Every structure is written in C-alpha cells, then in structure tokens.
C-alpha cells in the first residue's frame, strides 16, 4: 500500500482456545484509501502484522455470506464495509450470538442444522423433465422472490435478541427459507415444514424486534417472512382443531 494513504486504528478481537481464557482485543494500525474494504484491511493485518489471524472469507462480492462479523457492534459483511466510513477507528468482533472458535471464526453448526431442518428445497413435485418447464406467473414468483435472496450469512442471527436468549430458536434465516418454499407454487411440502415452524423454537419465539431485516445485506426482510410464517402457523392450528379426527 502507498505511503500517502490514510491510517486507522483497528481493534480486532483475538482468541486462541489453546492459550486464551477469554477473547481480548489487539489494536493494529492499518493504511486505507477510499476503496479499502474491511476485508482488505483484515487481509493487510494477516499479511503484514498478524499471520495467525483467523477469519472467514471467500467471494469478496457479498454473494457467499462467509465474512459476517460485528463492526462497532453491528452485524455486517466485511466485504461490503469500507474503512472510509470509520476514520476515527473501528472495533471488530466475531459474529454475535454464536460460539467463538478462534478469533473472528464462529461455530455455525446450529445455524446450518436449522436450515437443514426446514427442508429448504422443493418437495412433493413429481413433474418429469419430459413434461417441459414448470412455469410460473410473475404473481406466483413475486410471492417468494424476495425471500429467495438469502445468502446464509448469519447476520440476522447476530442481530436477533431472541436467538441470543434462546440458542435453540431456529431463527430468522431458517424461517425465511421455509416461507420461501411454502409460498412457491411448485412446492407441496408445507405440511412437512409446519412442525418446525409451529414448535416451541419456531415462529412464535420471535417477538418482532425487526433488527434482522435492518442488518440483512440482501434486503430479504426476514422479519416479514416470520410474520407470514406466524399467520400460516395460526391457520394450520385452526385447521387442525376443526378437522375431524
């Protein structure tokens, strides 16, 4: 990096489970210009100051969802966050509400298991390729299109106070994906997903703070998906009560 670049102090959370009792912060002096992302800055630290710094990243384009972390206590993607917005310094921490494995790397096992549990794929559609494309109208696609933009970054879980209180809550992304498929005209698997949504750790754990939608980097609006999920859950309950046994 050029000598005439600006410099900023970055407080970065460090934690090595083999040597540290608890996470701590180390301050690094990092050069930056108008185009330097937080991910670039972390790369500078790793290449020049702390080779043992651990963090996740991949695409650099807000597609893979790998580089989520807390930036001044706000969940953000490092690749979409720019150092020019933090001229007075910045504090970087591992993604909130997740167990820390090392430095900025968190254990996302429960997150992945929650996504798997709601079966995020089309179910019950026996249409054969020989029958041609499974067409949808624009109106049918509009029902789920926004919810299909989720990149599984986990920022909504870091923002969710209920997930912080109850780590068994399946969470915003899982419920959003369930709603994405439940509202897809090609899918017939809502009945298989409803037990997850109706359960103790399903949609009714949400108290509708709405912060999950504020931090979503793809504007998926998981808060709206959860409220739709509550309506579907209530309808499912009423139908079950009235249905003859």
UniProtKB/Swiss-Prot annotation:
Residue ranges of every copy of the 2Fe-2S ferredoxin-type domain listed in the record: 13-98
Amino-acid positions noted as binding [4Fe-4S] cluster in the UniProt annotation, renumbered to this chain: 150, 153, 156, 216
Entry keyword Iron: yes
Domain of life: Bacteria
Enzymatic reactions: a quinone + succinate = fumarate + a quinol; a menaquinone + succinate = a menaquinol + fumarate
Domain 4Fe-4S ferredoxin-type stretches: 141-170
Cofactor(s) demanded: [2Fe-2S] cluster; [3Fe-4S] cluster; [4Fe-4S] cluster
Subcellular location: Cell inner membrane
Keyword tags: 2Fe-2S, 3Fe-4S, 4Fe-4S, Cell inner membrane, Cell membrane, Electron transport, Iron, Iron-sulfur, Membrane, Metal-binding, Oxidoreductase, Transport, Tricarboxylic acid cycle
Co-factor binding details: Binds 1 [2Fe-2S] cluster.
Residues holding [3Fe-4S] cluster: 160, 206, 212
Entry GO MF terms: 2 iron, 2 sulfur cluster binding; 3 iron, 4 sulfur cluster binding; 4 iron, 4 sulfur cluster binding; electron transfer activity; metal ion binding; succinate dehydrogenase (quinone) activity
Binding site for a menaquinone: 15, 227-230
Topological type in the membrane: Peripheral membrane protein
EC number(s) on file: 1.3.5.1
Residues that hold [2Fe-2S] cluster according to the record: 59, 64, 67, 79
Alphabetical GO biological process terms: anaerobic respiration; tricarboxylic acid cycle
Enzyme class, spelled out: oxidoreductase
Assembly and binders: Fumarate dehydrogenase forms part of an enzyme complex containing four subunits: a flavoprotein, an iron-sulfur, and two hydrophobic anchor proteins.
Family per record: Belongs to the succinate dehydrogenase/fumarate reductase iron-sulfur protein family.
PANTHER family: FUMARATE REDUCTASE IRON-SULFUR SUBUNIT (PTHR43551:SF2)
Its job: Two distinct, membrane-bound, FAD-containing enzymes are responsible for the catalysis of fumarate and succinate interconversion; the fumarate reductase is used in anaerobic growth, and the succinate dehydrogenase is used in aerobic growth.
Official protein name in the record: Fumarate reductase iron-sulfur subunit
Organism: Proteus vulgaris
Lineage: Bacteria, Pseudomonadati, Pseudomonadota, Gammaproteobacteria, Enterobacterales
Underlying gene: frdB
